[in-house]
């Protein structure tokens, strides 16, 4: 059985959570006996199609403009052309029996036309791994005006993407509730995020490199954007200034990088360090060295996301500290397993008190970290996810 995996972000050139998760899924499917081809954009290539192999996974990179540009018009333009550029690059590689199933990831919402063409040619089913409800989160955050032409534009492609899916997997029960209010006719179910459960051996490379040998490291790794409300975590770092061995380390890329850099300087935060994105292998080494995993979701969100970065924390038995939008079902899930301290965004004093408790009590850090690993094994196992998706596809 040959499966096509379609995503706008992939290793090794990108290290965002979606790229890591899809590669882990691809590797798991391969271990189960499937042939896997990942179809994804390439951003610095001259050829229309470049083929590559990573960990036995075949990768077809089609020529594309930059998707993560700060210029939002340029970004939207290039995303709109994703399907057209992909089809132009790969159509001569395809026959009626090339693929027996398609698994595609959203965001982006612009792969609907490509999925439709492949489904028609290969007569195969498709499964949509739906993570962020775009453009809804942009409307919630005020980045897109409700009922504007730009909303209607994105909504058209959003629905077109959903129309191509035989099955749609969302992150949580709350997200299904929100989704079905607007789109009631699709075949939806809960599909958690996932992770390979093999931890990385502990190292001290980054502690030595950054002169953090004796520090309690509060770590944030991943997308640094408006949806994460990064100022929320920088305020936490400011509140922890009196604790001399507490250090905040931010690693990643996104629209809010300049904001956190400015706030570090403005507030003279000598307990905070930012470094740009690093490779997946280096990221795993760094995760093995930190003490507390941070995350944040903007309070304006109406959807209820499960940040993929939490999986990396749980693999390494790192206790989790974060804040979410109101009624997010992460709170009861983490409370059930005792895997960390999660508060509603805006409860700054509670967040700070939890940060202090984790700083002062190593035993609590160890206990919460072990509980997080148990949560991972129960809810987010990549083997379970792979088997579930292939069962839905009937392959």
Regions found by a protein language model. Name each.
Residues 49-51, 200-212:
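A short helix/loop element that forms part of the nucleotide-sugar donor recognition site in Leloir-type
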Residues 209-228, 233-237, 249:
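Conserved donor-binding/catalytic core segment of Leloir-type glycosyltransferases
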Residues 171-174, 191-194:
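Carbohydrate-associated surface elements
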Residues 357, 364-378:
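A short, well-ordered alpha-helix in the C-terminal region of glycosyltransferases
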Residues 1-58, 240:
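N-terminal subdomain of nucleotide-sugar transferases
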Residues 110-113, 117-121, 148-168:
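Membrane-proximal helix-turn-helix segments that form the acceptor-binding/catalytic region
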Residues 251-252, 257-284:
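Nucleotide-activated donor-binding/catalytic signature segment of Leloir-type glycosyltransferases, i.e.
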Residues 228, 279-288, 293-314, 319-332:
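Nucleotide-sugar-dependent
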